[in-house]
Amino acid sequence: MSYNSSYIYEHLEPEGFIPDEISLISKGKNSRSFLIKKENKNFLLKYYKTDDFIKRNRLKAELNFLNLMIKGGFKNVPIPIKFNIEKNWILLSWLNGNNIEKINKSHIRKLIFFINELQSLRKSELINTIQNASEACFNLNDHIKIVFSRLNLLEKRLGYLSFLPSDTYEKFK
């Protein structure tokens, strides 16, 4: 699938959203992300792959989770502006930020705080409004295992992860 500018305009114009500028941000395994500029405002446009071997709709899953977080009081969550389930795209408000080049203790603390906040949603009736994600976690240990599983993949790609105490990391390998 070619996600060129004319392809994107084809999808956004019928929705009444005509971008001034379109730039590719990333080509991930599950989606393509674009920075969309319109009237001096930034937006994020994501196209999800349709050939998902998991056979679940990633767009619906993300949309449901974003709505859960918004209803749950999270403030640093992109807001869905427009979406098209059939064409597999979503337009979101833009959140300013920077890429993390090197993980430090502050990043880890923020991640732990975020996971704790997510855990608070478990007690909410809102949690029953979404399906489980492919890496759904229902307790802190599940979150920790997922994080260390991802760190293991990162270590294989980048080498030793010096920001973690080796004895802590070894327990989860």
What are these regions (language model features)?
Residues 40-43:
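Glycine-rich phosphate/pyrophosphate-binding loop shared by adenosine-nucleotide-utilizing enzymes
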